[in-house]
């Protein structure tokens, strides 16, 4: 017999087949002992690595919206939840921004620390209601970068790599 084990690590699905399963006691608790798997699958359906936005310095995106029947434009600030080379996810602000799938927002300004503004258009690809720990409900919008120049894409990739290197260095010192 074999047991299929599935888990997630950093939002990446990990799966393996466990053979030779034995029920044992470990530190006074029931547990399973298995042979090391021959193969471990890491399943990530992404073209780009996704970085959860650092809590040390929050990322924001300024989204221009037209109000007063197209006579005036204001920028609505949205908190960035995660970012990749292909797009980002934001918490939709409770006021000032109406969002629906396939909506496009031109001339958005992604504010990266130490880098400045990345100007791009965003297309909303998906929307999810998220229930927070305190019971409040927010809307999460997954957005794709459109009309992103090569230089701006490279800047985003450098930022992601820098933050990931810093996180890995902190993990190693623990």
Language-model segments: which ranges?
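Structured alpha-helical
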Residues: 1-174
